[in-house]
UniProtKB/Swiss-Prot annotation:
The lineage of its organism: Bacteria, Pseudomonadati, Bdellovibrionota, Bdellovibrionia, Bdellovibrionales. Keywords: Ribonucleoprotein, Ribosomal protein, RNA-binding, rRNA-binding. Pfam families: Ribosomal_L4. The keyword Metal-binding does not apply. The keyword Ribonucleoprotein applies. One of its GO terms (cellular component) is ribonucleoprotein complex. This is Large ribosomal subunit protein uL4. GO terms for molecular function: rRNA binding; structural constituent of ribosome. One of the primary rRNA binding proteins, this protein initially binds near the 5'-end of the 23S rRNA. It is important during the early stages of 50S assembly. It makes multiple contacts with different domains of the 23S rRNA in the assembled 50S subunit and ribosome. It comes from Bdellovibrio bacteriovorus (strain ATCC 15356 / DSM 50701 / NCIMB 9529 / HD100). Residues 50-89 are annotated as: Disordered. Part of the 50S ribosomal subunit. GO terms for biological process: translation. SUPFAM superfamilies: Ribosomal protein L4.
């Protein structure tokens, strides 16, 4: 169990907190992270693509030309997949790309992503995310940490902080419930509040899976 500093927004130490080893010191396996990211992205896909089969194309009730004497192959319908404007054989149809991934694997992936940031020194614990709701103020805070893009995680959503962060496209703010592997890997760093640490540990607990 590692003890890390709790910082204010001037990057000054204001306390300390212990990080559970089974969540923030998990050995990283790329194949697990890859699987979890695939699962997330698959669930986001709309899957509304569709091509018309022979039975859905309009027209084609009449034989397009006589059986013999044309020098070409015989055809019984202009809707045939062999005809220009005809149907498509085995084309994409509406479907869901989502698949089931065990909770244990999802929780393990989240622990690995957090452990990776912790190992790289890109995980920061702050005392609070209370804000005046001004983007300029928040931008100044983030510059003190030298961050160009990061996820900002709070135990509960602060409306003013949320409003200020929406004008910063390279930063993403959400509560612990929204914490996910894809965003942790996409952004350079993570800033989480001291109060959210316990909730994160609870989310990543393999005993609950």
């Amino acid at each position: 169990m590692a003890t890390v500093n709790v910082l204010n927004w001037k990057k000054e130490k204001v306390g300390s907190v212990e990080l559970a080893a089974d969540v923030f010191e998990t050995p990283v396996k790329k194949e697990v992270l890859h699987t979890v990211v695939q699962w997330q992205l698959a669930a986001r896909r709309q899957g509304t693509h569709m091509t018309k089969t022979k039975g859905l194309v309009s027209g084609g009730g009449k034989k397009p030309f006589k059986q013999k004497g044309t020098g070409g192959a015989r055809q019984g319908s202009s809707r045939s997949i062999l005809m220009p404007g005809g149907g498509t054989a085995f084309g994409p149809q509406p479907r869901s790309y989502a698949f089931v991934l065990p909770k244990k694997v999802r929780r393990l992936g989240l622990s690995m992503a957090l452990s990776h940031l912790q190992k790289e020194g890109k995980l920061f614990i702050v005392d609070s995310m209370a804000s005046e709701g001004k983007t300029a103020e928040l931008n100044k805070r983030l510059q003190a940490f030298g961050l160009k893009k990061a996820v900002l995680v709070d135990s509960v959503v602060d409306d003013k902080f949320n409003r200020a962060s929406k004008n910063l496209p390279t930063f993403k703010y959400f509560p612990v419930e929204g914490l996910n592997v894809f965003d942790l890997l996409k952004y350079d760093a993570a800033v989480i509040t001291k109060d959210s640490v316990a909730k994160i540990v609870d989310r990543c607990s393999l005993e609950k899976a």
